[in-house]
Amino acid sequence: MKTRTEQRRLRHKRIVKKIRATNHDNRVVLMVIKSLNHISVQAWDFSQNIVLASSSSLALKLKNGNKDNAKLVGQDIADKLVKLKLTNVVFDTGGSKYHGRIAALAEAARERGLNF
């Protein structure tokens, strides 16, 4: 039986495979990385293989990555992408469920003007 970490990695590989297969208009991918204590997000451009913007609870000097701080991270990344005039994105949960901290981050990003 596979461990939870292996299962999450396999789910994430499937998600990335689907994103690459269906992302024909080369939208930016918001990739969420969740650890036990912190949360971070990167805006990837898969066509050029570069990170356009990133934000994390560590970079914002937040104490932890709880739901309130995840909202702040979502607002920060949304502000950075709106400044770059990138509003249409694809959201990648990183193999985790769309629940809790990840949902809070996504909703905060939507409120600031991102479409996904």
Curated annotation (Swiss-Prot):
Gene Ontology MF terms in the entry: 5S rRNA binding; structural constituent of ribosome
Biological processes annotated in GO: translation
InterPro entries recorded: Ribosomal_uL18_bac-type (IPR004389), Ribosomal_uL18_bac/euk (IPR005484)
Keyword Kinase belongs to the record: no
Keywords for the protein's UniProt record, in alphabetical order: Ribonucleoprotein, Ribosomal protein, RNA-binding, rRNA-binding
A GO cellular component entry from the record: cytosolic large ribosomal subunit
Signal peptide positions (record): none
Family: Belongs to the universal ribosomal protein uL18 family.
Assembly notes: Part of the 50S ribosomal subunit; part of the 5S rRNA/L5/L18/L25 subcomplex. Contacts the 5S and 23S rRNAs.
Main function: This is one of the proteins that bind and probably mediate the attachment of the 5S RNA into the large ribosomal subunit, where it forms part of the central protuberance.
Name of protein: Large ribosomal subunit protein uL18
Species annotation: Mycoplasma pneumoniae (strain ATCC 29342 / M129 / Subtype 1) (Mycoplasmoides pneumoniae)
Gene that specifies this protein: rplR
